[in-house]
């Protein structure tokens, strides 16, 4: 089996999503292995415009399995909105989309830290999208993050309370979109 990998050599926005969209009809598996919802790719499918931030663009290929790997950081609100938007067009998400149980979740506190960090840089700010991606990867590498697989546990909120949220003394509404109740196929590994 041949494998092709599309990798961007800049900071994103090179048009990877458009290239993948063109090529998806030739592949059985489309996998997203890293990144977050800071950018999106716009796809026209059956006369309708769709903007995807997390879900691979192979979702429109009726024969392709789409994977979201453990290197991807997922904003549950954006992810749920994408799924809801696609289901309005009767796309069979449940049989075509798998997500790693090790993919990390972007929390509201990650966005707060991102905004605070960017503001503190003054004229030297980096132009963050303020979507919490950098702080989520910091938690991932520091082994403090909340992962998709954690949502299966009855007491996943305890892990959240024991994470950096408790250390920095903030309070957040825990998963207001109820995305932890979505029925998705999760890859156990």
What would you call each of these model-derived segments?
Residues 160-189:
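Catalytic phosphate/metal-binding cores of nucleic-acid and nucleotide-processing enzymes, i.e., regions
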Residues 1-159, 163:
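Non-transmembrane, aqueous-exposed alpha-helical and coiled segments at domain scale
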